[in-house]
């Protein structure tokens, strides 16, 4: 509702995007129900983007660009290993990735027996932006969350890679999210 009000009051274009990357949790009937509910509430949209589950080629191309620029690397850590390595956790319960696989050599990577997830190398500097509701938000990603996964070990692309790829392709300039997602914006 807030996204719709924000867009309509500014004369913008409302985009509906179905974020259905996770094949285990997302189903076509959920997306259909979501649309039906929005219509029932009187919330319309101007553009319906292709569902993320059908945009794998776009995410693969974005990932390949990051790989070409050496901005991603394979990570072989299990969740259990990460829980143990990052204790104590951040105050919000988020795991802070300690960089375990960031500097592995080619020989060390070749010796691994697990399929890797892929992490984005975050900059070692502070970033800031002005959120329309929360004001100026500043974070140091390397300290506050560490390098984050952009492709899971099963090959599914992460939300963070998908949404920026989709926003760029769709010319999206304003994003309305819950404050719980502010740190991943």
Where are these regions (language model features)?
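Active-site cores that bind ATP or allylic diphosphates and position pyrophosphate for catalysis
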Residues: 79-185
């Amino acid at each position: 509702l807030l996204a719709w009000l924000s867009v309509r009051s500014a004369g913008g274009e409302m985009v509906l995007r179905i974020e259905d990357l996770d094949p285990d949790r997302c189903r076509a009937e959920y997306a259909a129900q979501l649309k039906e509910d929005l219509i029932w509430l009187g919330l319309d949209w101007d553009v319906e983007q292709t569902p993320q589950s059908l945009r794998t080629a776009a995410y693969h191309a974005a990932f390949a660009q990051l790989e070409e620029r050496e901005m991603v690397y394979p990570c072989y850590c299990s969740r259990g290993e990460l829980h143990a390595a990052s204790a104590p956790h951040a105050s919000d319960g988020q795991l802070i990735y300690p960089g375990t696989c960031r500097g592995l050599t080619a020989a060390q990577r070749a010796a691994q027996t697990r399929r890797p997830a892929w992490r984005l190398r975050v900059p070692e500097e502070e970033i800031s932006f002005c959120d329309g509701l929360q004001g100026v938000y500043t974070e140091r990603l390397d300290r506050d969350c560490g390098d984050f996964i952009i492709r899971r070990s099963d090959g599914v692309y992460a939300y963070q890679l998908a949404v920026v790829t989709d926003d760029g392709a769709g010319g999206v300039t304003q994003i309305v999210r819950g404050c719980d997602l502010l740190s991943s914006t």
